[in-house]
């Protein structure tokens, strides 16, 4: 029984570790703006385009939570926006 509980907890932790968060990028590598977007846009965008669990407008850019590890999100150190 203890082994089963440990297995389930370990399996749940894998999901937490493999999920990440961050800003989605547009085609130029810039943060995806939500400045003039309707309410709920970022959540829909994150879920449909990045398979994220949720998202919101962290004015002025969308921010996504629960992004799968294989999806790219904006990174300060590898920023290619406007270059």
UniProtKB/Swiss-Prot annotation:
GO biological process, one term: defense response
Entry annotated with the keyword Signal: yes
Gene Ontology cellular-component terms listed: extracellular region
Keyword Signal: yes
Taxonomy, superkingdom: Eukaryota
One of the Pfam families matching this protein, by short name: Toxin_3
Reported tissue expression: Expressed by the venom gland.
Keywords on record: Amidation, Disulfide bond, Ion channel impairing toxin, Neurotoxin, Secreted, Signal, Toxin, Voltage-gated sodium channel impairing toxin
InterPro entries (alphabetical): LCN-type_CS_alpha_beta_dom, Scorpion_toxin-like, Scorpion_toxin-like_sf, Scorpion_toxinL, Scorpion_toxinL/defensin
GO molecular function, one term: toxin activity
All copies of domain LCN-type CS-alpha/beta, residue ranges: 20-82
Modified residues (Cysteine amide): 81
Localization (cell): Secreted
Family per record: Belongs to the long (4 C-C) scorpion toxin superfamily. Sodium channel inhibitor family. Beta subfamily.
Record remark on domains: Has the structural arrangement of an alpha-helix connected to antiparallel beta-sheets by disulfide bonds (CS-alpha/beta).
Function as written in the Swiss-Prot or TrEMBL entry: Beta toxins bind voltage-independently at site-4 of sodium channels (Nav) and shift the voltage of activation toward more negative potentials thereby affecting sodium channel activation and promoting spontaneous and repetitive firing.
Protein name as it appears in the record: Toxin To12
Biological source species: Tityus obscurus (Amazonian scorpion)
């Amino acid at each position: 029984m203890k082994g089963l509980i440990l297995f389930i907890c370990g399996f749940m932790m894998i999901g937490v570790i493999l999920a990440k968060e961050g800003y989605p990028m547009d085609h130029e590598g810039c943060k995806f703006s939500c400045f003039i977007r309707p309410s709920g846009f970022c959540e829909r965008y994150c879920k449909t385009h990045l398979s994220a669990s949720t998202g919101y407008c962290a004015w002025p850019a969308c921010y996504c939570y629960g992004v799968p590890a294989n999806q790219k999100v904006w990174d300060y150190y590898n920023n290619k926006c406007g270059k």
